[in-house]
Regions:
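Flexible, glycine-rich active-site loops centered on histidine and acidic residues
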Residues: 176-207
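Short acidic, glycine/serine/threonine-rich loops at helix termini
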Residues: 19-20, 134-137, 165-166, 191-197, ...
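Short beta-strand segments
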Residues: 9, 126, 155, 180-186, ...
């Protein structure tokens, strides 16, 4: 069958030009907190408004493992009077932001796969959040790269990258295409509340891409042995922003239309599901955890990954076997596991690895690959 000869034949990565350290972020956030508490001192004293608490780099690193993140714009994101990135609006005849960074990551993946636009049959943009409803960003990228065929957008929150690769594999298996470019533009700072102590430190911006191909001739190809997907509905990770807001009989505050999560519930509910899914997948393939040389896990929180890997592997796992990019990139939505794979892939011929994403939805996808 076709599905036995489908490969990830190349990956790509685009990184924004600006970085923010935890110390820089804390200086900004704590200045905002001080200003907020001063400006609202009477309301705080009367109990009508809750006083905000400052934060620290040490707290952030312990709680998440994050030390740094890349961002699309830095100055306004760190301005205590603004607290979000600010970018110029673009004319509809200009390439959109997501398409622009998607083209850059896509070209990197194409170069690493040894393919050209003429070789590609389809473009899938799969991301945690899209900047518009239509026309599809994938079709815009398709046009910019000069690719014939088709394109579409999809969103599965934190698992969008792996679900996108799985969709590409399904399209190839069905005979719709032979080579598909999957792109994951993640401008996560745009839907982050940087005024919130619980979330202001979490996100970073990035774009990843992968070439999924039938019968690849790439010198650095990885056969996809299996994909396993699972979704379970939950409101514990939620973003309310959407076109229905426009017609609802409600006036939303800005923070109501941004990322929200109940972190403790996510930890308690998602982590066991990830362990169960991976164990079931390995059992189906008659594999054990010892057969997996590397694990490229979702990069949301180092403590989640430690818990999952300790359960799977009966103890601590070294960073070479399960690379961590959280310290440099922060949570990049759905892109983290592919960043880890792109930067820290050390498989030798015949060795197997596992790429896994999980989070909002809830959604989980695990992809098992083998180096050829």
């Amino acid at each position: 069958m076709r599905m036995n000869n489908i490969y990830i034949s190349g990956t790509g990565l685009w990184i924004p030009p600006y970085g923010i350290t935890n110390d820089e972020l804390m200086e900004s956030y704590n200045a905002y907190v001080k200003k907020f508490n001063t400006d609202n001192s009477e309301e705080i004293a009367s109990g009508t408004i809750k006083e905000l608490s400052p934060s620290s780099s040490e707290f952030v690193e312990k709680a998440s493992g994050i030390k740094h993140r890349y961002v699309i714009e830095k100055d306004h994101a760190l301005d205590p009077n603004y607290m979000k990135p600010l970018i110029p609006a673009r004319d509809i005849n200009e390439l959109s932001l997501l398409a622009e960074i998607g083209v850059k990551a896509g070209k990197d993946a194409m170069k690493n796969a040894g393919v050209t636009a003429d070789d590609i049959d389809a473009v899938i943009v799969s991301t945690a959040n899209l900047q518009r409803a239509y026309p599809a960003v994938a079709i815009e990228i398709q046009n910019e790269l000069g690719i014939e065929g088709y394109g579409y957008d999809m969103m599965v929150a934190c698992s969008s990258t792996t679900f996108g690769i799985s969709n590409a594999m399904a399209d190839i298996t069905a005979g719709k295409a032979e080579t598909i470019l999957v792109i994951n533009p993640e401008i996560t700072t745009a839907h982050n509340n940087m005024k919130s102590r619980e979330s202001h430190f979490i996100f970073g911006d990035v774009c990843t891409a992968s070439v999924v191909q039938l019968n690849s001739s790439s010198k650095n190809k990885f056969k996809i042995l299996d994909t396993k997907l699972k979704t379970v509905f939950s409101n514990n990770i939620r973003n309310e922003f959407g076109f229905i807001n426009h017609i609802e009989n409600k006036t939303y505050q800005e923070d109501e239309l941004l990322f929200k999560q109940n972190g403790r519930s996510v930890f308690k509910e998602v982590c066991p599901m990830v362990v169960q899914l991976i164990e079931e997948q390995l059992n189906t393939l008659n594999l054990s955890t010892d057969d997996i040389s590397q694990y490229w896990m979702h990069q949301a929180n180092i403590n989640l990954n430690k818990w999952i890997l300790n359960k799977l592997l009966d103890g601590d796992v070294d960073e070479k076997r399960a690379p961590n990019v959280l310290d440099e990139f922060g949570n990049t939505g759905s892109a983290g596991s592919l960043i880890a794979f792109h930067k820290f892939n050390h498989l030798e011929k015949g060795q197997k690895g596992l790429i896994c994403s999980f989070g909002g939805g809830y959604s989980i996808c695990s992809i098992i690959i083998e180096k050829e």
